[in-house]
Each structure stands twice: as structure tokens, then as C-alpha cells.
Swiss-Prot record:
Protein name: UDP-2,3-diacylglucosamine hydrolase
Predominant place of localization: membrane
EC numbers: 3.6.1.54
Family: Belongs to the LpxH family.
GO function term, MF aspect, one: UDP-2,3-diacylglucosamine hydrolase activity
Subcellular locations according to the entry: Cell inner membrane
Organism the protein comes from: Shewanella sp. (strain MR-7)
Cofactor detail note: Binds 2 Mn(2+) ions per subunit in a binuclear metal center.
Residues involved in Mn(2+) 2 binding: D41, N78, H113, H194
Taxon lineage: Bacteria, Pseudomonadati, Pseudomonadota, Gammaproteobacteria, Alteromonadales
Listed GO CC annotations: cytoplasm; extrinsic component of plasma membrane
Functional summary from the UniProt entry: Hydrolyzes the pyrophosphate bond of UDP-2,3-diacylglucosamine to yield 2,3-diacylglucosamine 1-phosphate (lipid X) and UMP by catalyzing the attack of water at the alpha-P atom. Involved in the biosynthesis of lipid A, a phosphorylated glycolipid that anchors the lipopolysaccharide to the outer membrane of the cell.
Binding locations of Mn(2+) 1: D8, H10, D41, H196
């Protein structure tokens, strides 16, 4: 048996090839799986459950069917933090806390999206703090649909422009934040996404940090079993 972790698919109507690749993943990679964990940014943007695109609703129906035979867990990312209970229920997904600890085949493991550890990006962390307030999210949800979409498009555009000007270091997790989370949770293993830099980092103290990759050019999945971890790339070309 094995547990699968994915993240940063950034699904959108503009990149249906990624959705197709994800559907192939759902067809071929879930045999003997104990669970599927989606570590945020499943969608490129999410302005509200009431504005879900047709492709997202179709995907929800697919995930709902799969959830009848294995649990699907979801942690919010920085692009889909407005994804709510309505869509999660439709997709058969259980929304987990931002930082979640679990026992993975005897290894205490902390899982998260990962953006909270990019502490050198001060501007983003200010925005992240604002969006963490339930009142701010409620206020946004009360806006007309067109206004919500316009705000989301503006934030997305500003984020893409800003990221092009930020250094490699600022866009990565801060080592001190990683150390602090290990100390806070008393876990020996960490799994996250967000940075789009798939890797397995082994520490001298025996801890391990695993970063799942994005799905822009190829798929990425972390397979965890009693035998260890395997970070796999999944070519989009099904042939």
C-alpha cells in the first residue's frame, strides 16, 4: 500500500492539457493507494465555489467517484485559498488544516502547501496575513461575481509580474522557518509544494524535507510507502 502526494497543478481552462494529464494520473496511478493528498494550488485561481468553471465541476464529479474507494485530502494553496466546503463536498475532498501532522507508515510527518515558509518574501507574507482573516474572506465572498473575478485577475497579474523580479532565494523557503516547523511539530519528515522545486532534502539530524513539483511541463507525484519515498515525474505524453 502507498500514499500519494501532489500539488501545484494550477488547473485552468487555458491549460486543459494539464487537466487531461491529471485525468490520466487518476486512471493509472491510484491502484493500491491508501489515500491521495493534494497540497494546494490544484487550480490556477479560485474566486469562489459559485464561480467554478465547467471543467472544474467535471473534475469534481470524477474525484467524487474516486473518493468512494479512497480518501482524498486537500490543503489550501496560495491560488485556491477560497475553495470552500461546497466544492470540496462535491469533489469528495476533506479539507485539512494549513499545517497537518500524520503518521506515514511509522514516520511522523508534517504536510503543508509551503508558502508560509517563504518568510523572506515580505510583501507576499503581508498579503497572506490579510487573507488569513475570516472576515476578509467573507467580505470578498459578498462582492458581485464580476468584481471578485476582476480582483482575482488583478492579484494574479501582479503576482506574476512581481515574481519575475524576485530573486531565487526570496522565492524559496527560508531554512530557519523549516527548522522552526520541525521543532514545533516534532516531526521527522516534511512534505510540501509551492516552490516548484521538486527535491528530497536530507538533514544531518535525520529529518527529511520533500518538495513535490508543479505540473506545468510534466506531472509530479510523491509516493510514500513502508519502503520509503519515491518522487516521480510523469510525462504529459501518454504514449
Amino acid at each position: 500500500m502507498r500514499t500519494l502526494f501532489i500539488g501545484d497543478l494550477h488547473l485552468s481552462a487555458d491549460r486543459l492539457d494539464i487537466t487531461q494529464a491529471f485525468n490520466r494520473f487518476l486512471d493509472t496511478e491510484l491502484d493500491d493507494a491508501d489515500a491521495l493528498y493534494i497540497l494546494g494550488d490544484l487550480f490556477e485561481v479560485w474566486v469562489g465555489d459559485d464561480l467554478a468553471a465547467p471543467f472544474a465541476l467535471e473534475l469534481a464529479r470524477r474525484l467524487k467517484q474516486i473518493s468512494q474507494r479512497l480518501p482524498i485530502y486537500f490543503i489550501h494553496g496560495n491560488r485556491d485559498f477560497m475553495l470552500g466546503k461546497q466544492f470540496a463536498d462535491a469533489a469528495g475532498m476533506q479539507i485539512l488544516p494549513e499545517v497537518t501532522c500524520l503518521d506515514l507508515y511509522g514516520v511522523n510527518t508534517v504536510i503543508l502547501h509551503g508558502d508560509s515558509m517563504c518568510t523572506l518574501d515580505k510583501a507576499y507574507q503581508r498579503f497572506r496575513k490579510l487573507r488569513s482573516f475570516a472576515f476578509a474572506r467573507w467580505l470578498y465572498s459578498c462582492l458581485p461575481k464580476r468584481k471578485r473575478q476582476a480582483i482575482a485577475d488583478k492579484i494574479r497579474s501582479n503576482s506574476q509580474s512581481s515574481n519575475q523580479q524576485k530573486s531565487y532565494v526570496i522565492m524559496d523557503v527560508e531554512p530557519s522557518a523549516v527548522d522552526a516547523l520541525f521543532a514545533q511539530t516534532h516531526c521527522k519528515q516534511m512534505i510540501h509544494g509551492h516552490t516548484h522545486r521538486p527535491a528530497i532534502h536530507n538533514f544531518t539530524n535525520g529529518c527529511k524535507r520533500i518538495v513535490v513539483g508543479d505540473w506545468y511541463e510534466q506531472g509530479s507525484v510523491l509516493v510514500v510507502s513502508a519502503d520509503g519515498v519515491d518522487l516521480k515525474s510523469l510525462p504529459f505524453d501518454a504514449s
